[in-house]
Amino acid sequence: MKLNQFARLTPDFKVQVAELKQIGLQADPDDAFSQSATDLFNAFFPEAYTLAAKEDKLAQVAVNMDQTLAAWLAKKPSKMTRRDFYNVALQLLGFEAFTDFDLNDPFKMMTATKLPSLDHDLTSTADLLKAVYLLLNTRTKHLVSYLDDLANRGFLKDFQKKQKKPTHLLFNGKVQQVFDARQAVREVVWIESDMDTDHDGQRDLLEATIYRPKATDQGLKVPVLFTANPYFHGTNDVTAVTHVPETTLAVKTHGASKAEVTANPEEPANLPHHPVNGEATQAEAYAEENSMYAFNDYFLARGFAVVYSAGVGTRYSDGFRTTGGPEETDGAVAVIEWLTGKRRAFTNRTDGITIKAWWSTGLVAMTGKSYLATLAMAAATTGVDGLKTIVADAGISSWYDYYRENGLVVAPGGFQGEDADVLAVDTFSRQKSGGDLINIKQAWEKHLATITHDQDRTTGAYNTWWDARNYRKNANKVKADVVLIHGLNDWNVKPTNAIKFWEAIADLPIQKKLVLHQGQHVYVHNVRSLDFLDMMNLWLTHELLGEANGAEDVLPNVVVQDNVAVQTWSAYQNFASPAAEHVTNTRNLKTDFEAATDQFTDHATATFNAQHDTSASFETAIITPNSAYANSRLWLTQPPLERDQTLEGIPHLELTLAIDAPTGILSVRLIDLGMAKRFGETAATVALNGLQLGFDYKTTDILEFKPTAKPTPSKLISLGHINLQNPKNAYEVQRITPGQPFHISLDLQPTHYHLPAGRQLALVIHGADMAQTIRPIKTTHYQIDLANSSITLPYRI
């Protein structure tokens, strides 16, 4: 086990003492050592209410091989050895003597686990207080810090009773759980937008669900974590509308210019406002939906309000879904504007009674994963006031990069046949209310047909519809600080979405952080080896509470999880830069790779059908040395590596080839070859319900990325797809003459990948990708000019 920690601060001793006193500990350096030790260790068992109960708890802790903590304290000691203190500390952190560590040498385990310690014996009360302060900020076996663990057991439950008025509590630069999340006020309001997406002549009203600390009713104003969640009110069965992958790749007869595919923002309609008949300070509707994001729940107990809005076209709101369109961005912005006092909301949809977010400080962070993170990124590119930061996990920065690639229809990994119209149906939760649906069904079906037409599955080309859903082109407007989290094995929302957004905001005068993990489309807030919750606590305390805690400097710019060394996270200044830390090597496909042939015929669809394969089984087979698809691919290998190497950046392919057809699909996979136990792409549960989100509150599982039980022969590092008629970009078209050579350039997905010595790099070039592209029936023959083809690989040095 490794408990990496990036968010721990080391303030001077006076600050440490003041903070210890603030959380209710006896922390006077002039007190006798024995009295201070007794007071402190007794305080660490808040679940024990009497001295007798505390004595029993102390007797359960071993100081060394000879005595318990209760017996040691009874001797009124005047000092404590470093070894004895950390024997006690480890047990307080949840580790077991004799099982997890040796009482004769706790430091061996602490070093391996990356737990901090003082480097000397405790010979004074000041030493003891320093050790206790560090202990409180040390991570436990249960992922959270020791102070968090104490608070989960009731240590801070009476904090507010001792204050003249409700307040936030900060410790080590981070806000603490001193609010009872069980008592949160739950309410619903309807925010007036500027849009009429269902074309009924009225501004769409957008439902927003609010959970705010009860202390706001006593005058406390709080910042807000806002999650724009289209799934919040449920989803629909999309089996009937999911596309069957087409069997013919269209020959494109004409392309377009950049100007022709550039979307121009539409002027907002001059719609009348909903009438106002009065104002209220209390909502009329209870929030019946439960909060569904553990990250937000964690901060609710720390004095942040949490707001969800599903947006246009969802249950209890007006409008129609647009799958990432400007209307969905505007809907998220409308919620922020209400939270900052710049837009009206109503207590219900009919009476015209307005209500303000009077409990809000007007400082907002947007959070969430996938579609939720996408809307956070979209809102940030508007530059809306009040949005201080986004914490965006696996977000889409351009919807073309989600459903298309280089002129091809490309499904997100794991969802073959999905497209923008399918997702619109999936999230159109208004249809769950029959009384609502009967009034809008015809108009919705007409609207949906427009999406199906405009997404253009025939050519897969980039057009104005997709351009309107490319948030990166407005990245220069971003004013909010940005945290991006992404899985390096996320073939659903592929890594290019994060890295291209990261590059787009690189020169902006904002703070930005990037976390890259080895998972697929998953959260990391409950991964034990990373102190992600503490990192974001430090970040949000700075961003939303205005604490000068140095978060922008303490937290690394880039944190990346290693794919070989277990539970290892490394800090870097940037991704794929600066030049002093990186090098690119261009390798010729003929002289630097071994290949049995330079040509293949793509029979993948026939093989797929004959094998009764699935998308998942195809993805395994296409990168397996001995495969049923061996004749439908080109397999190129490099010699085994003589030393460890780390790929970091965007692999780039230059390829000269000829095909026997006027169009074709080319897929490329970069492979790590060699039998090994590699990480699973989904973190495994290591403690069921082990992460507690607040005192007597919700729990969630603790996870960890682990190597697979059995070795595998290969693993996908990166991939790319291209329509061979689109060698330059996704809108200009090249005519292909069958049998005549032509050239293409292709960027693969960004990666950070550690290749150990002895492994081999392999390059797989094939045609249709059964898991992601369409599935042509017609076979195509590919002839690759290896001598005039190359791949450029980026390395961290």
From Swiss-Prot:
- Does the keyword section mention GTP-binding? no
Q: Name one Pfam family in it.
A: PepX_C
Q: Which GO terms describe its molecular function?
A: aminopeptidase activity; dipeptidyl-peptidase activity; serine-type peptidase activity
Catalyses: Hydrolyzes Xaa-Pro-|- bonds to release unblocked, N-terminal dipeptides from substrates including Ala-Pro-|-p-nitroanilide and (sequentially) Tyr-Pro-|-Phe-Pro-|-Gly-Pro-|-Ile
Q: Which SUPFAM superfamilies match?
A: alpha/beta-Hydrolases, Galactose-binding domain-like, X-Prolyl dipeptidyl aminopeptidase PepX, N-terminal domain
Annotated Gene Ontology cellular component terms: cytoplasm
Keyword Protease belongs to the record: yes
EC number(s): the record gives: 3.4.14.11
**Residue pairs linked by disulfide bridges in the UniProt entry:** none
Enzyme class label:
hydrolase
Name the domain of life this protein comes from. Answer: Bacteria
GO biological process terms on file: proteolysis
Which keywords has UniProt assigned to this entry? Aminopeptidase, Cytoplasm, Hydrolase, Protease, Serine protease
Q: Where in the cell does this protein reside?
A: Cytoplasm
Q: Which residues form the active site?
A: 370 (charge relay system), 490 (charge relay system), 521 (charge relay system)
Task of the protein: Removes N-terminal dipeptides sequentially from polypeptides having unsubstituted N-termini provided that the penultimate residue is proline.
Subunit field text: Homodimer.
Q: Which family does it belong to?
A: Belongs to the peptidase S15 family.
**What name does UniProt use for this protein?**
Xaa-Pro dipeptidyl-peptidase
- The source organism is Lacticaseibacillus casei (strain BL23)
Taxonomy, top ranks, is: Bacteria, Bacillati, Bacillota, Bacilli, Lactobacillales
Per UniProt, what is the name of the gene that codes for the protein in this document? pepX
